From Swiss-Prot:
PANTHER family: PROTEIN EMI5 HOMOLOG, MITOCHONDRIAL, SUCCINATE DEHYDROGENASE ASSEMBLY FACTOR 2, MITOCHONDRIAL. The lineage of its organism: Eukaryota, Metazoa, Ecdysozoa, Arthropoda, Hexapoda. It comes from the Eukaryota. The keyword Ribosomal protein does not apply. Belongs to the SDHAF2 family. The keyword Chaperone applies. One of its GO terms (cellular component) is mitochondrion. InterPro entries: SDH, SDH_sf, SDHAF2. This is Succinate dehydrogenase assembly factor 2-B, mitochondrial.
Amino acid sequence: MLRQFIISRVGRRLQLPMITQSRLASDLDKTEYTTPGEIVDYDDPPHLPVPEYPVRPDEPLETRKQRLLYQSRKRGMLENDLLLSTFVAKHLKDFNAEQTAEYDQLINGVSNDWDIFYWATDTKPTPPQFDTEIMRLLKEHVKNHEKVQRIRQPDL
């Protein structure tokens, strides 16, 4: 009798977490997820100082391209990492000094990476100072007419 009592108590303890898990799983099945209809974007407060990116006029072209390759891969948000790293892998080797400087200004002159993403995807209008030949190339790259899967960064 005591043995049956102990087995039943231990059995209930072991079954309790499983019942809880199945109850939670069934609750999750009923949950619906929706994406917001519009982008919520607030202006930066005026009291936040944004540091100016230092201009490097004496930097050799190859060194600048290597730096831009690294900076395009390490943006801090996956969306831009994928878009910019694939863009650089495709176009950077063919850029001349002026185009390289434009790309440098684009990715380092903007204080918010979401701005680059919204401009490249045509979610927001591009400001005139950043609406350059390089931005137009980036927008074409983002449209992905070739239907290339961009689920990871290209190899170095």
